[in-house]
A protein has these predicted regions:
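Residue-level marker of intrinsically disordered, low-complexity segments enriched
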Residues: 43, 56-58, 104, 120, ...
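Positively charged n-region of N-terminal signal peptides that target proteins for export
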Residues: 1-4
Length: 207
């Protein structure tokens, strides 16, 4: 009888070890998958940040003077490579070229007139998780005339950005999707600056 109990106990012990090993192996696979996903996410964020830094290096020139002072097509291609799409538009003999780069979820659009940058735009970019400093109360406290630099210093760089220069007026429209306190994933704050001074602002679902 003792022999039967011993065999049974040994069998249960082996079964327990086997189940533990399976559980450990399953947990190990799950952890490995999570680590792989996080690594891929970190690489994407890193690549997007590098793209954003290159975007920031593009100089926008005066539209009324054929992009004077702006980066050339060659300058931009050195930073971003060859575009995915190009388009040329002519209005009253005034020619503009649109170059578009698609990098994952991020789209960079640069307009040349005819060979120097007159506008630049980046959409789909997000800085990733950061402190939610920009809530509805903070948004409402931002006054017309506040400088772009002051807003960035307080709330961080915007995610999307559009910049142009016309008749000496530099216009920047900046959107924040991260670093904000929102009701849902679609929440955002949009601020427009002229010559570094806030002229208008809108928000969607901040709280």
């Amino acid at each position: 009888m003792k022999k039967k109990y011993l065999v049974a106990a040994t069998g249960l012990a082996l079964l327990g070890l086997s189940m533990s090993a399976c559980s450990s192996n399953s947990g190990s696979k799950s952890d490995s998958a999570k680590t792989s996903q996080q690594k891929k996410k970190n690489e994407t964020i890193s690549q997007n940040k590098e793209l954003r830094e290159k975007f920031d290096q593009i100089k926008v020139g005066e539209l009324s003077n054929h992009g004077e002072g702006g980066s050339t097509i060659q300058d931009v291609e050195k930073l971003l490579g060859k575009p995915n799409t190009t388009d040329t538009t002519t209005v009253d003999s005034y020619k503009t070229k649109s170059y578009i780069w698609n990098k994952g979820a991020v789209t960079v659009t640069v307009q040349f007139a005819p060979d120097k940058v007159v506008t630049k735009d980046i959409t789909g970019f997000k800085w990733g998780k950061r402190d939610e400093k920009l809530d509805l109360a903070a948004f409402n406290s931002i006054q017309d005339g506040t400088s772009y630099d002051d807003v960035v210093k307080k709330y961080g760089e915007p995610d999307s950005l559009n910049e142009s220069l016309l008749l000496g007026t530099k216009t920047v429209t900046a959107l924040w999707y991260t670093g904000i306190k929102g009701k849902d994933a679609g929440a955002n704050a949009s601020l427009t600056f002229e010559n570094n001074s806030l002229t208008s602002k809108t928000q969607t679902d901040l709280k």
